[in-house]
């Protein structure tokens, strides 16, 4: 019962990850301090997000040697081949005593690439530059993609926060506060960098409870409603005028028919 969202920002060549703070079962839920997104021991260039079993989360966060140190294994050498042939046996070993009540999945960010590892030890790499796991994953992923299209002027953190908020409002088992991480030590101004200028036209469809800078919109709500009222009044006026003309024509026709 979790939501973890990952996004690869191509402008800064960095992966950002965010997760919720909820622990729950079918009846109860509580907030926890354990981060669901973190760096494995000794590797600031790698980022991991876990959903499902908290035992898996504990092991991935605190057991050393899951990934060799950077002086033994460079970031560029960690690719799909390495994860399948070298990383997968390590995960298989530490999950040998897991049972069916310990389901899990994880996101692994290396460099600017995102991988998803599933409970059967299969590894997937999405074609999109984002992915999400957990009960709220599909909702968060959909909301985030919409925000990328409609609100690219918002910072990465703002877009991720909005997407996670939508997931938590729609799915039982995930809840704020949200924890954010990135797989490099980059300045805060890069984290909040506007990725590109807004070039969209038309009306934006964004939830009214999300802060939106109306100065960047193509038309304000008041202007839109005013235009609708004006068109409606003009249309009704034309109908009344046409009705009056038809009535006069009908009366003249009746007068001519009289013997």
Stretches with model-predicted labels:
Residues 40, 50, 171, 200, ...:
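Intrinsically disordered, low-complexity segments enriched in small/polar residues
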Residues 56, 69, 177, 206, ...:
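Intrinsically disordered, low-complexity, compositionally biased regions/tails
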Residues 1-100, 124-157, 174-183:
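Conserved short S/T/G-enriched processing/targeting/catalytic segments and their helical context
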Residues 219-259:
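Long, low-complexity, intrinsically disordered segments
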Residues 114-128:
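Short, hydrophobic/aliphatic alpha-helical segments
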